[in-house]
A protein has these predicted regions:
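Bacterial Sec-dependent N-terminal signal peptides
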Residues: 1-29
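Polar, glycine-rich mid-to-C-terminal structural blocks
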Residues: 216-220, 225-272
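TPR/Sel1-like alpha-solenoid repeat signature
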Residues: 135, 208-215, 227
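Membrane-proximal, proline-rich intrinsically disordered regions
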Residues: 20-63
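Conserved, well-structured interaction surfaces
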Residues: 41-57, 78-149, 165, 169-173, ...
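Short, well-structured active-site flanking segments
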Residues: 27, 146-157, 221-228
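Short linear capping/connector segments at secondary-structure termini
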Residues: 29-33, 87-91, 156-163
Length: 272
């Protein structure tokens, strides 16, 4: 009888050990995990949103028109005011530190998507459309980087923190890489302006327009002219009524006939 009790107790201990092990070895429940996440198109679409967040980054404004001599800043001691006035120094140009860090954060989101999207049980053609959108967004991030810093580290996959401090790649190499990515994306994306729930998503012309802009800024004039003319002759885009550009009625969500915005961040009134 005593032996039976010992066996029962030993069995209970083993069961407890296994059940505790199974209970403790769980994937995080408060965030997506690559090993279990990439299954459906709905998950692909959800993973696309962090990538599009990169279009809302203020670099396109603050290091563009906001730093031009036509803009007067209210606070002359602010970092961007000093950049605009030509008085910024290595000690106080914190906006540039933030931009470098944040842009590579957006690039990480894009790389994470591109490293994992093929695992989804979705038709390849559909997956490629999502990947093409992400490649355009990633190219835009590198366009900003090379426009400000020239040579930059070219990171096209998720890397470890130890690998994050590698050497810079020559600007020309990064430009060549961006153009090749955009060529691939243009082949996969729809030639139609996106509408309904897809309004604001990047289409073929967005990829080509960014390619033309990159080519122009990097003295690839023949390519810039060729791509720009192709867009002018074949795309559904056109100039918008100038008066409406600065009113809410000109927002692409409010006026589907606004065919001027090619790549843009859509803000919905009362939401974002």
């Amino acid at each position: 009888m005593k032996n039976k009790i010992k066996y029962i107790l030993a069995g209970c201990c083993l069961m407890t050990t296994f059940s505790c092990s199974d209970f403790l070895e769980r994937y995080p429940l408060d965030k997506a995990v690559n090993d279990t996440y990439w299954k459906t198109e709905a998950q692909l679409r959800a993973a696309l949103y962090p990538c599009y967040e990169g279009l809302q980054y203020d670099l396109i404004i603050n290091l563009g028109e906001a730093c031009a001599e036509t803009v007067v800043w209210g606070d002359p001691t602010s970092g961007l005011s000093k950049v605009s006035g030509g008085t910024s120094s290595a000690q106080d140009n914190f906006p540039f530190y933030n931009y470098w860090r944040d842009i590579y954060g957006h690039i990480f989101d894009c790389n994470n998507f591109l490293d994992n999207y093929n695992a989804a049980d979705v038709p390849q053609e559909t997956k490629d459309v999502y990947a093409a959108e992400v490649k355009v967004i990633r190219a835009l991030q590198y366009f900003w980087l090379t426009s400000v810093w020239g040579d930059v580290p070219l990171i096209d996959k998720v890397i470890s923190s130890e690998e994050a401090y590698g050497p810079r790649n020559p600007k020309e190499e990064v430009v060549d890489w961006m153009i090749e990515d955009l060529k691939w994306a243009a082949e996969k994306l729809s030639p139609e302006i996106q509408t309904g729930q897809d309004v604001g998503r990047i289409d073929r012309w967005g990829a080509l327009a960014l390619m033309a802009r990159i080519a122009l800024q990097n003295q690839r004039y023949e390519l810039a002219e060729k791509v720009s003319k192709y867009i002018l002759d074949n795309s559904p885009y056109d100039l918008y009524d100038y008066e409406k550009v600065y009113h809410l009625e000109g927002n692409s969500e409010n006026d589907p006939d606004n065919k001027e915005s090619i790549i843009y961040s859509l803000y919905v009134k009362d939401i974002r």
